């Protein structure tokens, strides 16, 4: 509630909501619970920021431990969290940036991020460079989307 009041107090034009990494980290990940959490938060924010535009982002991929002391393996629940978010956004006509597939999807997202040294040691959180890259990728996607809008909407043509 306090975080929502803080967001509302900013009177934002755009609210970016990133879900999935924490939700998919638990072994008992539930798509239904994930949907309910997104719906609840979005509903609360829309009450206080009815004119804001909302942009969801999918998780980029992360690792989990394989057993108590096991090696880290790619989190198998991330792809389910991504699908849940993509379906949620599509069913509600919400904007969503699919970082998971932008950075390589099921086969390569984690490998690309690891090879670039963008994960911290826990293989969940990013390094400073990783967060900078995430921001740059999102910025690029927003600019491309805006340019596409300008080309197709403002002149009255549809490409």
Label each residue range with its predicted role.
Residues 1-36, 125:
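Conserved SGNH/GDSL esterase-like catalytic core that processes O-acyl groups on lipids
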Residues 13-18, 53-58, 95-99, 125:
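Structural recognition of the beta-strand scaffold that forms the well-ordered cores
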Residues 22-24, 60-63:
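Short, catalytically relevant binding-site loops at active-site mouths
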